[in-house]
Structures are given as structure tokens and as C-alpha cells.
Design a protein with these regions (language model features):
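N-terminal hydrophobic targeting/anchoring segments and the immediately downstream early-domain regions
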Residues: 1-185
Length: 185
């Protein structure tokens, strides 16, 4: 019958490892000033992803995206941590240019780099606090090991290259602290 076939399909799906192609967890934690990632670790009411739901849903890993938003939506605590960057902050009600596809202002490289480092540090804090549950993966061996040991594999990805200067120094630094993917989204 159709119902028995459905049960077989669901049974196979439950056993199939899930790998998330893109999530915005790090941005959400950064914007809520949760630099330790506690909302992810212990579960959170808002959002789509946290450690308890990852385990329950069979998530084996994913691309944890780092997106640097317009300065007018950066958390106020960010500016308190980086008073030297306040000159880059724009007013929240500023009219954005109509030709800007994402409806955000062009952001400075120094702001983007500082925000990117903070989001990577959130991922590192989460991994450091839970070495038995998840790990930042920088190569295939680590990824395979995570899957084999039932640990969640975090692959760090940046959306856009605003954080990288023209001499590519920041790219090398970001690579050395775990970044492995760059894309437009």
C-alpha cells in the first residue's frame, strides 16, 4: 500500500545524514550580543537552529555563514567594543541608494573585518565549549571524523568579501582561524 511505502521513505530519511547548505546562526548570535553562543548551546526560542534541535533532527554539519550587515543594524554593543570604528557607523534612518541591490550602504573593510572576526570567534567559542558535540572543520579528514563520531561539523563561510583587503592579508588570517568558504551568499 501507499502508506507502507511512505513509512519506508520516512525511515530512510531519518537515517540520512543532514548537511545544512547555509544557515545564519552566527549573524543571529552576533546581533543579539550572544558572543559565547549560549542560545545555540542550550536551545533558544527564536531562530531555526540550536544544538538540541540539531541533534534531534540529525544534522551532521553545515555551512555556518558570516554575513556582515549594514552598520545601521549592527548591535550597539559592537560599537562599544570597537570605539575606533564608530566613525564608520551610519544613521539607522539613512536613505539608501536605490541602485543598491541589497538595500544596504557600502560598508568599510575595517568594519566588515571586525564583525567577521567576532562571528568567527562566536563559532570558536561554541566549539571550544562543546568539543565532544561539534567542531570547526578545516579539511575533509576533520569533516569525516565529525560525521563518524556523531559531532556536528561547522564549516565557516563568508558572504561577500568586504572583510578582505586588496592585499589579501585578511584572507590569510581568516583562513588560519578556520574560514574555508567564500561566496556571494
Amino acid at each position: 500500500s501507499k502508506f507502507s511505502n511512505f513509512r519506508e521513505i520516512v525511515s530512510k530519511m531519518i537515517k540520512t545524514p543532514v548537511f545544512d547548505g547555509h544557515n545564519d546562526l552566527l549573524l543571529a548570535l552576533w546581533r543579539s550580543n550572544d558572543l559565547d553562543g549560549n542560545d545555540f548551546i542550550f536551545g533558544r526560542e527564536k531562530g531555526h537552529i540550536d544544538l538540541p534541535r540539531c541533534k534531534k533532527g540529525g544534522l551532521k554539519g553545515g555551512f555556518f555563514a558570516i554575513f556582515v550587515p549594514a552598520t545601521n543594524v549592527a548591535p550597539e554593543a559592537f560599537w562599544e567594543r570597537h570605539p575606533d570604528l564608530v566613525k564608520n557607523k551610519k544613521g539607522a534612518k539613512e536613505k539608501m541608494p536605490s541602485n543598491n541591490l541589497l538595500n544596504t550602504e557600502q560598508i568599510s573593510q575595517t568594519y566588515a573585518y571586525a564583525a567577521t572576526i567576532e562571528m568567527i570567534n562566536i563559532a570558536r567559542n561554541i566549539a571550544d565549549q562543546n568539543p565532544d558535540k561539534l567542531e570547526i572543520c578545516t579539511d575533509y579528514g576533520t569533516l569525516r571524523n565529525c560525521i563518524d563520531k556523531e559531532k556536528i561539523a561547522l564549516l565557516l563561510h563568508i558572504e561577500g568579501a568586504e572583510a578582505i583587503g586588496s592585499d589579501l592579508t585578511q584572507l590569510e588570517i581568516l583562513y588560519n582561524i578556520g574560514l574555508r568558504s567564500i561566496g556571494p551568499v
